[in-house]
Each structure stands twice: as structure tokens, then as C-alpha cells.
């Protein structure tokens, strides 16, 4: 009998609506290096759920465990009700996967790539042609069906991979950094296709990203840093928890301004390049009051509502950027010492 789940961060899934994905105290270690540290969460059916965090935070490792490509060191995970450790074949049959790196065969056509995939997933022979045509139309590639993939742009290849990932009608689509390296316009096009697919077929989407605009497309996001899940909620709720506006100042003496803000206003500011950054409630009244009392040459003032980057900064103390090199280098060094490859 499956034991009852512990309290799951940020979920209201009930016994009458079983989760599409359920993760309980999931851990993955590589020797002494912990890549995923006791994650617990649930994803609702039909939800677009995202993991936001810098490279090296543990996002891709988590997806690999959920897709049965890595064995958990400890804990449990269930995808479409199947245990990823005990029922890996059933998990794989019910999911589609799109990873960061392209995995298409660019020597053959778009149609041939999809036909090969249809054979792997045992799609009935008499359904293959119709299914392939349907998916190519869904991602606006019908007119390129007979063209070799090597002639495609990066955005077209990504759309073809989405078509391939959906060809066998999976219940869940996993997207690991689906638009990395693509320009903003192409990224937006890809997201339009993803949302259209969800409306048409009710698919659950689980994705990882370090792009703020992509995270805004999610119904809920989990924020990861240093192998841990540190927050989980809707983008709007996470930003609302900031409790105010974000102010950035550039002054003639930033050090003196930091001291003044702390002494006179009880505000803690931090330096970002040549600007000072802090949060206050009611910035529209705070800024005039500050300028009246500052007696410091203020060169620039910027007031913005909080962003997800501000949320991440508040939770972790650093901005979301490519901070994964050190973690990845440590992991590779550990695997080399063990005679493996990271």
C-alpha cells in the first residue's frame, strides 16, 4: 500500500483530484555532491508548472528523475500515478520530453523524424500518417514536412520537437529549458503553441527555465536555488508577497546614501552595479520625502513594480543569472574521480 504523502509545498491537490506529478522528499546525490535536496511538491492536471532558477540549481536533474533517466538517491516520485522507480516503462509511455539540446536527425525530413518516433511508441500503422499531419499542422510546419531538418531555423526545430513530443498523445509534456538560445520573438511563438496545445488537449506541462518572461507564462512556479525548492506559488502571488515597490537610485555618493536610508528611514539598500536597490511600500510618497531630506545629489530614480527577478533576489540574496558553473564543475570533477561522466 502506498504510504500517505507528506505535506506538499504549494499544492491544493485533493484525494478526488489526484496530481499529475507528485514528488516526496526527492534526493539525488553524485558522491558527496547533492544535486537535488529533499524536494516535495505536486503538479495539478492540466497545469503549466515551471521550475525557475539559475543553471546548476537542480532543475534539469529533477526532470531527468521524473522522466526515469536518473534514479533517485532517496525519496519517491509519481508521474501519472506511476512510480518512477518501480514503473519506469509506464511513466515513459505517458510522457513527452523536450530537452535543451536538439535531438532531431537533421539528415532526414521533418515527416521522417516523426514517422520514426511513431514507430518507437507503437502508434498503430493506420493512424501514423494522420497523426503526423495533425502535429505538423499544429506547429505550423505542414509546408515543410518534406524538407530536411538541416534546413530549419532554431525556432522551427524546436517546434518540430514539440510536435514529436506530442505525437503519441502524452498526458504530460516535460520541457527542459525549451527556448534556450532562441530570440525573444521565437520564444514567444513557441509559447503561443504550448498554450494552444493545452487548450486543445488539456495536457499538463512541466518546464524548467531561467528566463523571467517564460516563468510568467506558468500557472505556478517553483523557485529553486542550490538544489532546494525555496518557494512555490503563482507568479502574481510571489510578486505580491514582496509587499511594495522596487526603487533604484543612482547618487553621487552611494555609500553615504546607504547609511542615510538605514539611519533615517529604516531601509536596507544594496548596490547593483552603480545603482542602489531597495523595496518600500508606497514609493510614490516615499521618494519625494526622501529627496527632501537626503541632501545628496540624486542622479537617477527608477520605480518599478516587483518582478520575479526581484522575488528571486529577495529569497536568495542574488540575482538569477548563470551561476551554475561552479556547481556543474564540482559535479563533473566528482564523476571523473569515480570514472563516470556528468
Each language-model region and where it sits:
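Conserved ABC ATPase "signature" region
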Residues: 115, 119, 126-144
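Catalytic Walker B motif of ABC-type/P-loop ATPase nucleotide-binding domains
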Residues: 173-176
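Helical segment within the ABC ATPase nucleotide-binding domain
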Residues: 188-201
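ABC ATPase "signature
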Residues: 232-233
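Short, charged/small-residue-rich alpha-helical element at the C-terminal edge
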Residues: 244-319
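Conserved catalytic motifs of ABC-family nucleotide-binding domains
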Residues: 169
Amino acid at each position: 500500500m502506498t504510504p500517505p504523502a507528506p505535506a506538499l509545498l504549494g499544492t491544493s491537490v485533493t484525494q478526488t483530484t489526484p496530481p499529475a506529478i507528485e514528488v516526496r522528499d526527492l534526493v539525488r546525490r553524485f558522491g558527496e555532491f547533492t544535486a537535488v535536496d529533499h524536494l516535495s511538491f505536486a503538479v495539478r492536471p492540466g497545469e503549466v508548472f515551471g521550475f525557475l532558477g539559475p543553471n546548476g540549481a537542480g532543475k534539469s536533474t529533477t526532470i531527468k528523475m521524473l522522466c526515469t533517466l536518473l534514479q533517485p538517491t532517496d525519496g519517491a516520485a509519481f508521474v501519472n500515478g506511476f512510480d518512477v522507480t518501480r514503473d519506469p516503462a509506464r511513466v515513459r509511455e505517458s510522457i513527452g520530453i523536450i530537452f535543451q539540446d536538439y535531438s532531431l536527425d537533421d539528415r532526414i525530413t521533418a515527416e521522417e523524424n516523426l514517422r520514426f518516433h511513431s514507430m518507437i511508441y507503437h502508434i498503430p500503422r493506420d493512424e501514423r500518417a494522420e497523426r503526423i499531419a495533425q502535429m505538423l499542422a499544429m506547429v505550423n510546419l505542414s509546408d515543410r514536412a518534406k524538407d530536411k531538418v538541416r534546413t530549419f531555423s532554431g525556432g522551427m526545430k524546436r517546434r518540430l520537437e514539440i510536435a514529436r513530443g506530442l505525437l503519441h498523445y502524452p498526458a504530460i509534456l516535460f520541457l527542459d529549458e525549451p527556448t534556450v538560445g532562441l530570440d525573444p520573438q521565437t520564444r514567444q511563438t513557441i509559447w503561443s503553441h504550448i498554450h494552444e496545445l493545452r487548450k486543445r488537449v488539456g495536457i499538463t506541462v512541466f518546464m524548467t527555465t531561467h528566463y523571467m518572461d517564460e516563468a510568467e507564462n506558468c500557472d505556478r512556479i517553483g523557485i529553486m536555488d542550490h538544489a532546494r525548492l525555496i518557494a512555490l506559488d503563482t507568479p502574481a502571488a510571489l510578486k505580491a508577497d514582496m509587499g511594495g515597490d522596487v526603487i533604484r537610485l543612482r547618487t553621487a555618493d552611494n555609500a553615504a546614501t546607504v547609511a542615510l536610508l538605514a539611519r533615517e528611514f529604516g531601509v536596507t539598500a544594496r548596490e547593483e552595479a552603480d545603482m542602489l536597490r531597495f523595496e518600500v511600500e508606497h514609493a510614490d510618497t516615499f521618494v519625494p520625502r526622501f529627496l527632501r531630506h537626503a541632501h545628496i545629489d540624486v542622479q537617477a530614480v527608477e520605480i518599478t513594480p516587483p518582478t520575479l527577478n526581484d522575488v528571486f533576489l529577495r529569497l536568495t540574496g542574488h540575482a538569477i543569472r548563470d551561476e551554475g558553473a561552479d556547481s556543474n564543475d564540482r559535479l563533473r570533477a566528482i564523476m571523473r574521480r569515480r570514472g563516470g561522466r556528468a
